[in-house]
Amino acid sequence: MRLAIDLGGTNIRIAQVAEGKCLKRNSVACLATQDVDVILTQLFELIEPMIGETVEGIGIGVPSIVDTVHGIVYDAMNIASWKEVHLKELLEEKFGLPVAVNNDSNCFALGESLFGSGRLYENMVGITIGTGIGLGIIIHHSLYGGGYAGAGELGALPYLEADYEYYCSSGFFKRRNTTGAAESEKALKGDNDALLLWQEF
C-alpha cells in the first residue's frame, strides 16, 4: 500500500492506495497564503494518521515545476511561499519512507494511463483544471515530463489579454464572486445565468 497526495492551492488531498484502488481518503483546505512551515505542518498532520505498517512509500503531486530526482519543488502555483522546498528530503526524514515528487498534472495523466480511460490509448494528454491549469503528456504509454517535469505547464502561455490560467481556472469564477462548484450545481438545475457562465468559461 502507498500514500497518494495531491497538494494544491485550494486543497490538500491524501489517499491510501493499493493495486489501483483507493482504500481510505481525507482532505483539508490548503493554507496556501501561509509560510512554508505552516503548510508542511498541515501536510505532516494529514499523513500521520494514514501511515501504517503496510505503507511502502509516498507519492505526491504538486502544482509546480519539480526536480524529480531530488524531489525539490520550485515556485508552486498559488502557494506563494513555496519557492524552493526540498519536499522529498523533508518527507523521507519525517516518515522514513521512500518519496516520489512530480508535477500534479503529470501524476493525473500517468494515473489515467495506467488505471483509467487512458489505458486504451498509447498516446494521450491529461488536462487538469482547478486553482490552476496544467497538462500531462503520455507518449507510447510513458510519461513525458520534460525538463523539471514542466512539459505540460501551459497555464502561463499568453492568451488574449492575459494567459490561459487567467481564463481557464477557478480564478475565472473567483473574479465573478462565485465558485465553479456553486455554478455547476446551479447549471445542473437549469439556471440560465450559470449555463451562460459555463458557456463563456
Region spans (language model):
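Short glycine-aspartate micro-motif
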Residues: 2-6, 57-59, 124-128, 134
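N-terminal beta1-alpha1 ligand-phosphate binding loop
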Residues: 2-17
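Short glycine-rich anion-binding loops that position phosphate/pyrophosphate groups of nucleotides
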Residues: 10, 63-65, 130-132
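Residue-level signal for inorganic ion chemistry
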Residues: 14, 28, 60, 173
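Glycine/GP-enriched mid-protein hinge/lid loop-to-helix segment characteristic of carbohydrate kinases
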Residues: 15-18, 34-38, 100, 115-201
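Hydrophobic "anchor" residues
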Residues: 22, 73, 143-144
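Short hydrophobic alpha-helix segments
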Residues: 26-28, 77, 147
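Glycine-rich phosphate-binding loop and adjoining helix at the ATP-binding site
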Residues: 32-44, 48, 54-58, 64-123
